Amino acid sequence: MTKVVEILQYRLQAGSGERFHHIMQHDSVPLHQAAGITVLEYGVSLHDPDAYYLLRRFDGMVEMEQVLQAFYRSQAWLEGPRTEIVTLIDESHRVVLPYQS
């Protein structure tokens, strides 16, 4: 089984980078970790305060899809930071690559 890394890149609403990072740091990333998702890195881009990234690692493509489906359907996510996070994102891009540890 080939491990994979998922890179998410977000274009945030103007001026919301600091707020978004606070939500990620205190709400979203802890939820990811509680769900068994390995978060490798996350934060505000060095070149733009309203650009954000999230890197997550999974044991394979099938595991990634199963884990993410369960996570995004969970009450903890739906009743937690979901609405505020989604509201702050103007655009998102996703890339999945093989992970060499």
Regions found by a protein language model. Give the residues of each.
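Short, structured motif recognition centered on aromatic/hydrophobic residues
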Residues: 4-9, 20, 32, 51-56
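A structure-centric signal for secondary-structure junctions around beta-strands
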Residues: 2-4, 49, 91
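An amphipathic, aromatic/His-enriched active-site/gating alpha helix that lines ligand/cofactor pockets
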Residues: 22-40, 57-94
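Non-catalytic surface loops within mature trypsin-like serine protease
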Residues: 12-14, 60, 98-99
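Basic/polar N-terminal segments that are highly enriched at the extreme N-terminus
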Residues: 1-2, 101
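Short beta-strand micro-motifs enriched in acidic
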Residues: 44-47
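Short, low-order "capping/linker" segments at domain edges
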Residues: 93-101
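Short, surface-exposed ligand-recognition loops at beta-strand->loop->(often short) alpha-helix junctions
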Residues: 11-23
